[in-house]
Each structure stands twice: as C-alpha cells, then as structure tokens.
Amino acid sequence: MHVPQFISTGALLALLARPAAAHTRMFSVWVNGVDQGDGQNVYIRTPPNTDPIKDLASPALACNVKGGEPVPQFVSASAGDKLTFEWYRVKRGDDIIDPSHSGPITTWIAAFTSPTMDGTGPVWSKIHEEGYDASTKSWAVDKLIANKGMWDFTLPSQLKPGKYMLRQEIVAHHESDATFDKNPKRGAQFYPSCVQVDVKGVGGDAVPDQAFDFNKGYKYSDPGIAFDMYTDFDSYPIPGPPVWDAQDEGCCFIDGVDTTSVKEVVKQIICVLK
C-alpha cells in the first residue's frame, strides 16, 4: 500500500483500526471517595456531545462547547481534599475512551468570577499533570482506562477558600502527527471539561496566579501539541506551564471568620505561625 506523505504508516494503521466513535466527557466528581452524583449540567459545564476541540483559536478550548452556560450547583470541598473526576463515553465504568487516544491529562484552576464565565482569557493555573511514563511506556490515558475512568488529584493545601472553576483536559495524540492548522482533518484532540467547586473551611492564602490563556498559550508549534506518537520517543513535553506551586504563597485563611474579633485575629496569627 502506498502511504501519502502527509500521514505516517503508523498513523494510518491506527486510523483504520480505531472505532468511529471513541470520544469522552466528564460525568461525575468524587470528594475524598464520596460520589457527588451525576454532575451533567448540575455542577459540570456539560458539552452537548463527546466531540473533541482541535481549533486552538476556538473559545471552546477552555471549557468546551456550552462552556459559558450557567449551571446551578457547586461541588463542596476543602483545600487538601482528594478529588476524583469520572470520565466515560456512554456507559459508566466502561467505554472510557478508545485506547488509541494516547496522551496526557492536566488539571487547572481559575477563580470563579461570574455564572457565565466561559474560561477564556488569562485566568488559569495548572495544579496537576501526568503525561508519558517511559519506564512503563504508558500514557496518562492508559491509566485513566485502567482506573475505569476515574482520575485522582489533590486540591492544593494552601489554596484560599472561595469559589473556583476546575478544568480537566485530556489531549489525544493519535492524529497529531499533523496539526489542525495545516490539515483540519487531523491534529491533536482536546477534551476539556469544567466543574464548579466551592472550597470551604481552613486553607492558605494562595490565590492561583499563572494567568494562562489557552487560546494564546497553546501553539500549533508546541512540541507537546505537534507530537507524532508513531515515531520513537522516550519523553513527552506536557503542554502549558509547569504545575503551580501554591506553597510559595503563604498563610492560613479561615473561611467565614470575622477578623474584627480579637479572638479570631489571635486564631489567625496562631494558624500563620504553625
């Protein structure tokens, strides 16, 4: 078989082997192992389908299609809690995403500024990432499938209490041997999903400040976006900035404390000194 120059042999074989529908989206959130219930259009900005975003100029790159449509609830959590985002295509615990869709998974946070915020603009900080493990020759997506669509991460322990938008993103590289701007039929596939979270209780005073803008920060030339997974490689550069270090910020902050009270001011001072 003659293989056209614009597509590698490995990419063609993967294209022929994969099913027609192999996409995914987020359905639920767990806090410290407790299921918060079906989050579709409740606390998750749920897109109308499982299709990927490939255009880096699209506003849907931030929070997917319908990303600016309000949803009524927030997941309640505390700084330092373990959160689990649950992904699948149709059936819970099965049919997560096609194994050919190899790639990283990253998690981001932004201050919640408005019910209609769509995630565009310089508002995001990365709080977790996982890409390619050369020792096992496996991707984050492989781990997601093995875990039946469950992806764990921890909220920064020094995060200031308040309302936030959390964004998790899967990037699939089975067609990124060509970039979307050069060949719209191919390119890296982005699966972003945004969740409303209310961080309560005792935390720090760390406020996410990386100010990353997906439409400006992601480039078609980035080695973690224009990535040919069908060549030999032993490492992978995850797109975006490094993980935000919330520990750099500072002190304790107690949600809802009236610091006009001398007693509560003393509590704050003790918290800072710990």
UniProtKB/Swiss-Prot annotation:
It catalyses: [(1->4)-beta-D-glucosyl]n+m + reduced acceptor + O2 = 4-dehydro-beta-D-glucosyl-[(1->4)-beta-D-glucosyl]n-1 + [(1->4)-beta-D-glucosyl]m + acceptor + H2O. Cu(2+) binds at residues 23, 101, 191. Its cofactor is Cu(2+). Disulfide bonds join 63-194. (1,4-beta-D-glucosyl)n binds at residues 67, 98, 100, 177. Keywords: Carbohydrate metabolism, Cellulose degradation, Copper, Disulfide bond, Metal-binding, Monooxygenase, Oxidoreductase, Polysaccharide degradation, Secreted, Signal. Residues 1-22 form the signal peptide. Its EC number is 1.14.99.56. It comes from the Eukaryota. Its main location: secreted. One of its GO terms (biological process) is cellulose catabolic process. Binds 1 copper ion per subunit. It is an enzyme of class 1 (oxidoreductase). O2 binds at residue 174. GO terms for molecular function: metal ion binding; monooxygenase activity. Lignocellulose is the most abundant polymeric composite on Earth and is a recalcitrant but promising renewable substrate for industrial biotechnology applications. Together with cellobiose dehydrogenases (CDHs) an enzymatic system capable of oxidative cellulose cleavage is formed, which increases the efficiency of cellulases and put LPMOs at focus of biofuel research. It is found in: Secreted. InterPro entries: AA9, AA9_LPMO. GO terms for cellular component: extracellular region. Belongs to the polysaccharide monooxygenase AA9 family. Lytic polysaccharide monooxygenase (LPMO) that depolymerizes crystalline and amorphous polysaccharides via the oxidation of scissile alpha- or beta-(1-4)-glycosidic bonds, yielding C4 oxidation products. Catalysis by LPMOs requires the reduction of the active-site copper from Cu(II) to Cu(I) by a reducing agent and H(2)O(2) or O(2) as a cosubstrate. Cleaves a range of polysaccharides, including cellulose, xyloglucan, mixed-linkage glucan and glucomannan. This is AA9 family lytic polysaccharide monooxygenase A.
